[in-house]
Amino acid sequence: MTLSTPTGLAGFDDLLSSHVVMVTGKGGVGKTTTAAALALAGVASGRRTILVEVEGRQSFSRTFGTARWDYEQREFRPGLWGMAIDPADSVYEYLDRFYGLKRVQWVMERSHALDFVTTAAPGLKDLLLLGKVYDLEIQRRSDGRRRYDLIVVDAPPTGRIVPFLQSPEGVTEIVRVGPIQRQAGSMWEMLQNPQRLRTVVVSLLEEMPVQETIEAVHALRELGVDVGPLVANQVTVPRVSEPQRDQLRDLGASGLREQVTKDGARMSGRTSQLLLDLVRTHRDQVELQERLRDELVGSCALPLLALPLMTSPTFEVPDLEVLADVLALQLGEDGPHAQARFDDTELEAAIAAARPSTVSGGTS
């Protein structure tokens, strides 16, 4: 099966062309889920991948059913590693690497000095977290190849992503010499290089998330960080067409009941009215999605990938594999898990619902 593909994206080599993919989005839109799906897609494409969290929420350990993630890089699935970056571990590693002062860790922990420093120096905590991402990006294996082909970071939400990424620039303005200044400068170079890092912004096709996504994209561009694609999450699959909606509306509750009776079935007046209300609500949701997708892509001029709304009572790894395959299918790659969950018509309808036909950044 081949789904319609957004302009500017041709396969995983394009989507995952940057070494580091920072996934951000307004809280509650599913950025963590999207980050996990992207990581699984990376593994499916043959890339050694590490999935990184920086906010200490342990979302991935719960989702994948592993022990708590910490500062150690552990392979928890074939080809997929995970770690949780902690500012304290980052600063202890930094002190040991540049000054040989790992012995001060005990003193800092007892005196709560680290809490004082990170509070007194705005941006330092973000710099420590981002510094470890930079460290992962430059790591090499013994044969000179990168330790990881792909680094997927569940980044801070859109309300914090710019200060998070801006932290190296802020530090270089304060610290003019020394290893901190040099490393901050190197981190800034990584952020400005699209081959090394890009941001993927996740949104729901709802009013507030779309507006915040547009603002975040513009702010990231002003910062000089590569952005794209966008991901529309929890897209409602259109199951009733506009002509079908109009036909049912013209029939009305009594007409629908009469038609059902002619076909040899029975339907109460209450049930027929409920059905009409459900159809109207569904079509209203679909049409709202269409309007907001055009606003989103038109304002950002970026390709848009879609992830369908999943109706599972619990969200587990097989669901993530389905979403990873939905991404794959939109890029012309194989997606067996998605095709086992959705039929071709449902998948195409979900993708089409988030694919603008006339505005810049999309294709029919």
Give names to the regions the model predicted.
Residues K26:
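P-loop (Walker A) phosphate-binding loop of NTP-binding proteins
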Residues L95-L101, E242-Q247, P318-L327:
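Short, surface-exposed amphipathic charged segments that create phosphate/polyanion-binding patches used
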